[in-house]
Design a protein with these regions (language model features):
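AlphaC helix of the protein kinase catalytic domain
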Residues: 113-126
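Conserved short submotifs of the Hanks-type protein kinase catalytic core
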Residues: 98-112, 116
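AlphaC helix of the eukaryotic protein kinase fold
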Residues: 65-82
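Conserved activation segment of eukaryotic-like protein kinases, specifically the C-terminal portion
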Residues: 180-192
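Activation segment signature within eukaryotic-like protein kinase domains
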Residues: 135-136
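Conserved C-terminal C-lobe helix
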Residues: 239-254
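Activation-segment/catalytic-loop signature of the eukaryotic protein kinase fold
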Residues: 94
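Catalytic-loop of the protein kinase fold
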Residues: 147-163
Length: 320
């Protein structure tokens, strides 16, 4: 039997839900993480909220429970607050509410590249070589800025890249080091990071190379990586010029002598490539498009003589 000093189930804090106010300021509007998300205990759940002290401005809140490294997250968040780049959301405060830590950042309207990839798959489309080259040229300056501050994203993948609605620019979301340790999406991190190694700038470039290969092919990383040799398979149907493919292969190199030494070096190499005329999506070359043939024209038959119309005014419709 419970004694008066024992906490009863009724006294346990209720789980957050839509409408709850966090830090007497941010009202939760929608949970954007699936309830069955296996990464939730470590990476937390993502919420959309409105700032009641800023006219209802939208914000993104990440909820980290007791299972997460909250102290490490606080330290990492304070570092990210120093990042001032137009393609990185502004990082706000860190709020403790009950057993949870809430990390606040600026909201960005747009669609993730994972969402774009899935939408195109329904239409049998993938990213074209010109479109990818443009994306890399737009995104690498962000990595140059981060790495110059000795910061690493740590979880670069299509789901953590957003195409912003207002200007079409790519925006980096959900840094993989929010919990103090590295939490990277499977398939995008090099083996050294997946095995617990320290995050390094070249690992962001590796993840960017995997992301590029996924966008070009429409296939997940597991379908593109040989599990024995750990070599990446390049489908022959990829829409990529040889010069672009060469630079993408350098992004994916694990040999320090063969890969890019920095994001700035990768950016210079990609800026030197000619931009294709087309910067839009292309059909998946490995899929057969089934085209519906037009209905055959009817065979000509005998022509009936015209008969005069009797009893119909000009404004009346002809009988069906």
């Amino acid at each position: 039997m419970a004694t008066p000093s024992d906490p009863s189930p009724a006294e346990a804090p209720a789980p957050p839900e839509v409408g709850h106010l966090i830090g007497e300021r941010y009202q939760l509007e929608q949970c954007l993480s699936a309830p069955s998300d296996d990464a939730a205990p470590v990476q937390g759940r993502l919420w959309r909220a409105s700032d009641q002290l800023a006219g209802g401005a939208l914000m993104a809140l990440r909820q980290l429970g007791p299972a997460a490294d909250q102290e490490g997250a606080r330290r990492r968040w304070s570092q990210l607050q120093t990042v001032l780049h137009p393609q990185v959301p502004r990082f706000g405060g860190a709020i403790t509410a009950g057993d949870d830590l809430w990390l606040v950042r600026e909201w960005q309207d747009g669609r993730t590249y994972q969402e774009l990839l899935e939408a195109r798959a329904e239409r049998q489309l993938v990213f074209g070589g010109g479109e990818l080259l443009l994306l890399l040229r737009q995104l690498l300056p962000v990595l140059v800025a981060l790495h110059s501050q000795e910061l690493v994203h740590g979880d670069l993948c299509p789901a953590n890249l957003l195409r912003r609605d207002r200007d079409g620019q790519p925006v980096l979301l959900d840094f993989g080091l929010v919990g103090g340790g590295v939490v990277a999406t499977a398939g995008y991190a090099p083996p050294e990071l997946a095995q617990g190694g320290a995050a390094q700038p070249w690992m962001d470039l590796h993840a960017l190379g995997v992301t590029a290969l996924v966008l070009l092919s429409g296939e997940p990383p597991a379908s593109l990586l040989d599990p024995v040799s750990l070599e990446w398979r390049w489908p022959a149907t990829l829409d990529a010029e040889p010069e672009l493919r060469l630079q993408l292969e350098r992004l994916l190199q694990r040999d320090p002598a063969s890969r890019f030494a920095s994001a700035a070096q990768a950016l210079a190499a990609l800026q030197a490539l000619p931009m294709p005329d087309s910067t839009g999506p292309v059909p998946r070359a490995d899929r057969t498009l089934v085209l519906v043939a037009p209905a055959p024209s009817p065979l000509p038959g005998p022509v009936a003589p015209e008969l005069p119309l009797v009893g119909l005014a000009e404004s009346q419709p002809l009988p069906a």
